[in-house]
Amino acid sequence: MSNDALISALSHLVSEGRNPDTMDIDLLTSLEVVEKINQQDKQVPLAIEAELPQIAKAVDKIAQAFQNGGRLIYMGAGTSGRLGVLDASECPPTFGVSDKMVIGLIAGGPEAILKAKEGAEDSLTLGIEDLKAIQFSENDVVVGIAASGRTPYVIGALNYANQLGAVTVALSCNPDSPIAEIAQIAISPVVGPEALTGSTRLKSGTAQKLVLNMLTTASMIRIGKSYQNLMVDVKATNEKLVARAARIVIQATECEKALAVSTLKATDYDVKLSILMILTGLDLELAKAQLDKQNGFLRKAVENNQ
């Protein structure tokens, strides 16, 4: 795309427009500046609320993929790519899953997380190469993230995923964007022009992060990674998480701290097994068998053994 054509295309994007409420932001005090930004941020949850049915559709597809051994792949450039990497990296400690289950790919590779890699996002083939490098298949789900909705890196990847027969999801902050037209499921929270014109790390980035939170959290809940609203698959990999594991067991069972700690030690800090053993009186091997029988759904295992 020529420079003139790109300027024209960007001028029509909501996310690139000038915000009439912040035209004098350079004249304001620090308090007034942050008040202006805060006022703009309040629009984000409302924009996401309008997209909840689409988000739920994506959650169902992601959960189904997980249950069939598939993966969730985030793809984006710049801020969008970094947000995908961030959300993916939080899944192993939070839900006790492999770091291969949710993967964040960013245009330009890992180096681009810390420093922008010029030109990487403009390639229609680089996204395809990145998907091929992880053996992407029709069993996986790809979520293309781009505030503008027109990033070539994402467009190429979505087209490739469609050709394979995989589920494709687009997350953008502009209506009727190119990636929304390509993907099977389009999530488009339109948050309006940024407080600082074109700085889509602001409202657009916030909206993207909130949606990604929903996609992984809700899909993990759908495959049994919670009991009530407790993170029962959390991995106790440091002192804080060991303490959290004990607290979760106590909250779920109302047992004494000593029992929670001793049971956790007996299960090698497996929170699910510890809760099941305390609530049902099952020994370790029987608890494992019952949990496996219920495909890891702790609530079902508890209800069937009381």
UniProtKB/Swiss-Prot annotation:
Keyword Lyase attached: yes
Pathway it works in: Amino-sugar metabolism; 1,6-anhydro-N-acetylmuramate degradation; Amino-sugar metabolism; N-acetylmuramate degradation; Cell wall biogenesis; peptidoglycan recycling
Top-level taxon: Bacteria
UniProtKB keywords: Carbohydrate metabolism, Lyase
E.C. number: 4.2.1.126
Domain SIS: 62-225
InterPro entries named in the record: Etherase_MurQ (IPR005488), Glucokinase_regulatory_CS (IPR005486), MURQ/GCKR (IPR040190), SIS_dom (IPR001347), SIS_dom_sf (IPR046348)
Catalyses which reaction(s): N-acetyl-D-muramate 6-phosphate + H2O = N-acetyl-D-glucosamine 6-phosphate + (R)-lactate
A Pfam match: GKRP_SIS_N
Keyword hit for Lyase: yes
Record GO biological process: 1,6-anhydro-N-acetyl-beta-muramic acid catabolic process; amino sugar catabolic process; N-acetylmuramic acid catabolic process; peptidoglycan turnover
Subunit annotation: Homodimer.
Other facts noted in the record for this chain: A lyase-type mechanism (elimination/hydration) is suggested for the cleavage of the lactyl ether bond of MurNAc 6-phosphate, with the formation of an alpha,beta-unsaturated aldehyde intermediate with (E)-stereochemistry, followed by the syn addition of water to give product.
PANTHER family: GLUCOKINASE REGULATORY PROTEIN
HAMAP family for the chain: MurQ
Main function: Specifically catalyzes the cleavage of the D-lactyl ether substituent of MurNAc 6-phosphate, producing GlcNAc 6-phosphate and D-lactate. Together with AnmK, is also required for the utilization of anhydro-N-acetylmuramic acid (anhMurNAc) either imported from the medium or derived from its own cell wall murein, and thus plays a role in cell wall recycling.
Family, similarity comment: Belongs to the GCKR-like family. MurNAc-6-P etherase subfamily.
Name this polypeptide is given: N-acetylmuramic acid 6-phosphate etherase
Organism in which the protein naturally occurs: Vibrio atlanticus (strain LGP32)
Lineage, opening ranks: Bacteria, Pseudomonadati, Pseudomonadota, Gammaproteobacteria, Vibrionales
